[in-house]
UniProtKB/Swiss-Prot annotation:
UniProt xrefs under SUPFAM superfamilies: DsrC, the gamma subunit of dissimilatory sulfite reductase
Active-site annotation: C108 (cysteine persulfide intermediate)
Subcellular location: Cytoplasm
EC number per UniProt: 2.8.1.-
Taxonomic lineage from the root: Bacteria, Pseudomonadati, Pseudomonadota, Gammaproteobacteria, Enterobacterales
Organism, as annotated: Salmonella choleraesuis (strain SC-B67)
Name of the featured protein: Sulfurtransferase TusE
GO molecular function: sulfur carrier activity; transferase activity
Protein family according to the UniProt entry: Belongs to the DsrC/TusE family.
Keywords: Cytoplasm, Transferase, tRNA processing
One of the GO biological process terms: tRNA wobble position uridine thiolation
Protein's job: Part of a sulfur-relay system required for 2-thiolation of 5-methylaminomethyl-2-thiouridine (mnm(5)s(2)U) at tRNA wobble positions. Could accept sulfur from TusD.
Cysteine pairs bridged by disulfides in the record: none
Primary localization class, coarse: cytoplasm
Catalytic EC class: transferase
Length: 109
């Protein structure tokens, strides 16, 4: 559980939101801070992309899927593992989806 702006936000044992509808950009900043990340424009681009992906496909992207989809939309410079790991050092798919208020990707350990 997470306390944000005086409200209890239900999370799983790893800190992923149980209800994606509770997410807001302000909450994303708080989740990112808990992960040791200060969100830059580049982080927001990935976080918003992951949310759009989830809304379209009803699943959080695993790393391979995330890299490929990012490359298709933003080009090879941003659609590669090195770029994404620089932004999300504990795992791009795991951290980006957590900050985006989405369920943990199925293939993430």
């Amino acid at each position: 559980m997470l306390i944000f702006e005086g409200k209890e936000i239900s999370t799983d044992s790893e800190g992923y939101l149980k209800e994606t509808t509770q997410w807001s950009e302000a909450l994303a900043v708080a989740i990112a801070a808990n992960e040791g990340i200060e969100l830059s424009a580049e982080h927001w681009e990935v976080v918003r992309f992951v949310r759009e992906f989830y809304l379209e496909f009803n699943t959080s992207p695993a790393i391979r899927m995330l890299v490929k989809a990012m490359a298709n939309k933003f080009g090879e410079e941003k659609g590669n593992s090195r770029y994404l790991h620089r932004l999300f050092p504990k795992g791009p798919a795991k951290q980006a989806t957590k900050i985006a208020g989405l369920p943990k990707p199925v293939k993430c350990i």
